[in-house]
Amino acid sequence: MFRPRQYFFLLLVLAATTLPAAELRVGNSYQLIFTDVDQERLATSDGHVSIVSVVTRENEAKAQALGNRVPQQYYGDPKYRLINIVNFQQGIFAPLRGVIMAIIRHRLDAEAKNLQKVYTERKLKRNPRDDIYVVADFDGKAVSQLGMAPKSPEFAVFVFDGRGRLVRRWNDVPSAEALTAALQEAR
């Protein structure tokens, strides 16, 4: 038979497992770590200014719109990076994940070819493929770090300075002006 204390601990455990993730607050610093589809470790506090977007398959066009709003002056600058986290909302079976990662890498290769024109015009010697980051979040661990529920259909954009301080957060694609202001503040 359960005693009152055991009921209390049972309720405490159940409550802890059902609480939503805490939303990140602008001005606070966060040492978040993600692993992209190329197995590169990306941290919000490693000296890079990071634009982090969270997208699902349904709002993928917003990620493209965000990329189009990043000012070209930041293209190829190793101090800045755009990280797209694809939230698969825990809906992909493990055997399919490798195939999906291969498809994502193929799409990144194609995007790098498009970016090569911009890099050539700006006389950048870097390989644009090295500047494109996508995190395939199959299990919800990446979005949970950002205070989002793993099954959330939400789109979000975060800008972190090089020390991991959250400069801005949006729940939609920010204007080019707002994004530029956040990047300048994050420098």
Q: What residue spans do the PLM features occupy?
A:
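Structural cue for short, hydrophobic secondary-structure segments
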Residues: I51-V55, N84
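Boundary at the C-terminal end of the N-terminal hydrophobic targeting segment
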Residues: A21-E23
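Bacterial N-terminal signal peptides
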Residues: Y7-T18
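Structural microenvironment flanking redox-active thiols in thiol-disulfide oxidoreductases
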Residues: E60-N127
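A short beta-strand-turn-helix
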Residues: Q31-V49
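Thiol/disulfide oxidoreductase modules built on the thioredoxin-like
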Residues: S45-D46, P128-D131, D137-S175
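A short, polar/charged loop-to-alpha-helix boundary motif
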Residues: P174-R187
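Positively charged n-region of N-terminal signal peptides that target proteins for export
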Residues: M1-Q6
